[in-house]
Amino acid sequence: MIKLKNFLNIYNLNYKYQYKNKINLYLIRQGLNINLIKNLSSNIFLYMFIYNFKKYSLKLLNIFKLPDWNFFDCPNINYDNIIYYSSILKDNNLIYYLKNNLNIEFLDSILIKNNSIDIIFDSMSILHTTQYFLKKLGIIFLPLFDIIFKYPLLIKKYLGTIISYKDNFFANINSIIFSEGSFCYIPKYVKCNFNLSTYFKTNSSDFAQFERTLIIVGKYSYVSYLEGCTASLYKESQLHVAIVEIIVKDYGYIKYYTLQNWYRGDYLGNGGLYNFTTKRGICLNYSKLDWIQVEVGSIITWKYPSTILKGKFSISNFYSISFISNMQIADTGSKMYHIGSYTKSYIISKSISLNNSLNIFRGLVYIKPFSYKSYNYTECSSLIFGNNSLTVTIPYIKNYNNTSYVKQEAFVSKIEIIYLFLLMQRGLSISESISLLIIGFCSDIYNKLPFEFNLEIPILFSLKIKDIFN
């Protein structure tokens, strides 16, 4: 037993973001009821529409139930005994804290000069860098609750229009509790050449992060948005329930990147973060929405970014890498709803399952009767290696228009011993050989990331494989 404990401690040392930041925090821990909403809304009572939005969501809570169609049992979460709000007290020096505790080393680097970054720590935004030139263009990129104070009519107009509090169980809970997030508004005829980024970090034990992101892209506009996520290491699990709403108006274009490296738990499946996220966008005439995501962390992932192609000639692309191992479960995929005519969608998914992991891909393509000459192409490729690895593909196609066309392809393969043998004959170790094969398998997707992150993904994969096979 002592040897096993020491072994797990060594394994956990390899998780880069395991450190916990010792800092004074204001915490709210109580049951999921109206008193919690009042505590969370104490500073926004001037804007009753937010309070009412949360209150109406609470009234519908008992209507919903946890999904019962998953390949895994949803964890039994005690919603009366978790921390719903965690914020840094004002007596802390935030910049000193960031540089010395959070280990965010890019604050003084060239990277921040080409990005506008919002850093959300637990339940509050602790650093926001909005470039002066963005303000001159009329671009609004601020923490969600700053927007509520500064532009309440804008929030009232768009909040919950794409993902209602009636949508599903987790969307309903987020609508009750959401405490922070990001808001982005790109005016019409504006091409944003800066990368807008949000970094989420959960730090407190028994903490649940409920953030909400809302992005509006105006007519003939363009923006690139990236979110990154990490979590501290605890024996107890943490919870992350998020909502992302995206509205792309006529001729608009957005690239939405996601890099998630939450804590994945130990080799026995203890600890780790539960990630339940609802993401959805709507595209109007001639607009385009790209989802590009890389999933590495979290013990359980439940996420299906989807697009409503409402306008004619609208396009949506979904590119995903899901890389899991050692008791991790990823139930992910995408949904494409074709409503307008001449719409196109592409779903390209790459999943890698190593040692005792479960990877599920669900793809829904729905083409309505009045969506003429629309097209979808779905390709799901899976790679498995090690003991007790499982990958599952569940396509679901509804095509109600005989002028529209859907194409589906799926591949499952394993890392052949002969390939490893050939690489090891040339001086590579077992972990280096596996890394080379996996990186080559999914390079066409991570190459779509911005240059700075494109370089880091192979390193991240190599480190994870080295932890497993060395």
UniProtKB/Swiss-Prot annotation:
Protein name as catalogued: Iron-sulfur cluster assembly protein SufB
Function: Participates in the sulfur mobilization (SUF) pathway for iron-sulfur (Fe-S) cluster biogenesis. As part of a complex consisting of SufB-SufC(2)-SufD, involved in assembly of [4Fe-4S] clusters. Exhibits ATPase activity.
Keywords: 4Fe-4S, Iron, Iron-sulfur, Metal-binding
UniProt GO MF annotations: 4 iron, 4 sulfur cluster binding; ATP hydrolysis activity; metal ion binding
A GO BP entry: iron-sulfur cluster assembly
UniProt keyword Cell cycle present: no
Assembly notes: Component of a complex composed of SufB, SufC and SufD in a stoichiometric ratio of 1:2:1. Interacts with SufC. Interacts with SufD.
SS bond partners: none
Family, per entry: Belongs to the iron-sulfur cluster assembly SufBD family.
InterPro entries: Fe-S_cluster_assembly_SufBD, SUF_FeS_clus_asmbl_SufB, SUF_FeS_clus_asmbl_SufBD_core, SUF_FeS_clus_asmbl_SufBD_sf
Metabolic or biological pathway, per its Swiss-Prot or TrEMBL entry: Cofactor biosynthesis; iron-sulfur cluster biosynthesis
The species this protein was found in: Plasmodium falciparum (isolate 3D7)
Gene giving rise to this polypeptide: SufB
Induction details: Expression is not affected by oxidative stress.
Presence of keyword Cell inner membrane: no
